[in-house]
């Protein structure tokens, strides 16, 4: 069963909005382009006639959230909150698995590392317009990654790799990974500038 957490403040916010809609209207939580780098989550009104037979209904105290079959696995562990601060109020929707489906603990090492990169590393790099891709894992347990986007040519790549990405992945995959290297560093040859 998919676990989508809608906080009490978000439920109250939705209940106020739904009170102004025709009776029987609930909400729909969905992912556009699920399983891709361009995945985006959204929430919309869901009138009774828009409920599909293969939708999953998640019941909350004052409302139901409907999720379509395709979006369901990508909304695992999603969190919807309504936050109020000095700047005002806003709805936040965090879906760590929107870009990549959750993998099992017994999945191959490559899939588990790829999942960690997509769900933990890339969201941090996205703020700088960058991302990292897992290219291969050598027999010696070295994860070879390639930086892209805003990270390409950035002077902070080495620091990001050693202090951030490598530390995080080696702690998470202790005994399975021995190092994390940048493809250009691992592949240095005649084409390299330095």
Swiss-Prot record:
GO MF terms, alphabetically ordered: 4 iron, 4 sulfur cluster binding; iron ion binding
Binding site for [4Fe-4S] cluster: 151, 154
SUPFAM superfamilies cross-referenced by the UniProt entry: Fe-S cluster assembly (FSCA) domain-like (SSF117916), HesB-like domain (SSF89360)
Gene3D superfamilies in the cross-refs: Fe-S cluster assembly (FSCA), HesB-like domain
UniProt-listed GO biological process terms: iron-sulfur cluster assembly; protein maturation
Cofactor or coenzyme needed: [4Fe-4S] cluster
Cofactor binding note from Swiss-Prot or TrEMBL: Binds 1 [4Fe-4S] cluster per subunit. The cluster is presumably bound at the interface of two monomers.
Role description: Involved in iron-sulfur cluster biogenesis. Binds a 4Fe-4S cluster, can transfer this cluster to apoproteins, and thereby intervenes in the maturation of Fe/S proteins. Could also act as a scaffold/chaperone for damaged Fe/S proteins.
Family label: Belongs to the NfuA family.
Record note on quaternary structure: Homodimer.
Name the UniProt record assigns to this protein: Fe/S biogenesis protein NfuA
Organism: Aliivibrio salmonicida (strain LFI1238) (Vibrio salmonicida (strain LFI1238))
